[in-house]
Amino acid sequence: ELFSSEGEKRTIEKITGVESPILSVVIPSYNVEDFLSQGVKTILNHNNAGKIEIIIVNDGSKDHTTQVARELMDTYNIGEYPVIKLIDKENGGHGSTINEGLKVSTGKYFRVIDGDDWVDSENLEKLIGILEREESDIVMTDYSEDHATVNELINKKIYEFMIPGQQYIFEDLCYPGYGFDEWGPILATSCFKTQMMKDTQFKLTEKCFYVDMEFDVYSIVNARTVTYYPLDIYRYFIGRVGQSVSKRSFMRNHEQHAKVLFNILEYLKTIPNISQGKRSYILDKVVVPMTKAHYLIVGTYWTKRRFFVNFDKRLKNYGEIYHHPAVANRFVKFHRRTGAFLLKFNTVLIKIKRVVVR
């Protein structure tokens, strides 16, 4: 209900685009025929819509996603510079849609809004006005989780330590206790200078989940400045079947999770001149949390010895992470010492520990 009402606040007429858009919005779309139209309407439902470039990237959908996209183009495009564009491609995964969308983006800033998500139209209108005059490499805002099953929006404020509208040097926010806490710039909160992103010359892993973590790394490598505005814009839809953040999905796709982690570790080797602040940021905000999560997946969710041993053996090649105190906790050290033969007895061991502690 929240989703549909936002897209129907007013009637949207045909929209005349501009040669140099302020914001390029890439919409990765796979089997989202039930969501795409309403989501796009929320992006266009304001007076600054003509300054936006929407790039729908259909990732080999098996439903009518392409048809919906073409209907949106017919409904709203007019003039020499279409507001809505479509890339229709074979399935290559979420990363491939961002790769292809960025290539053709012409806006001053670039961001991603998934095909089953939506935005607050009024706040997006305000953001476009801000981006017109803003020059920071990254502009961050707030977002909310849309828990559809209970029809509730849960606002997420992760940049409250920043003074709204003040430009910060990214490097200065990389130090523990002062800058970014759990998260820095992420897909749900951030607009990135388009040319900066293109100059980074990255390619997200294709046909793979969890590439948002790769994006979080690539997007800050060349960033020098960052600014925050307290506008609640993005609506992250929670509750769709098959979302990659579920326990079952983590178990099913654990090899892809490991692949992304090791891709990031290898990428760090290719940028030896990156500042210590940014390197620490990447390790603390991306690599270490992913590594801890993976030990949870292979050690607690699966409890299969070979999964644990294979991952642990491979990680040993990256000593800084392998021995990191947040990674090499008591659980991990115990199963390393015992060759992971006791993984299947985790539940029993935990119960014994609780009795002993009492």
Located regions from the model:
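Cell-envelope/extracellular polymer assembly enzymes that use nucleotide-activated donors
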Residues: 21-24, 53, 214
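Glycine-rich, basic loop-to-helix element that forms the pyrophosphate-binding segment
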Residues: 88-105
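Donor-binding/catalytic cores of nucleotide-activated saccharide
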Residues: 115-226, 236-252
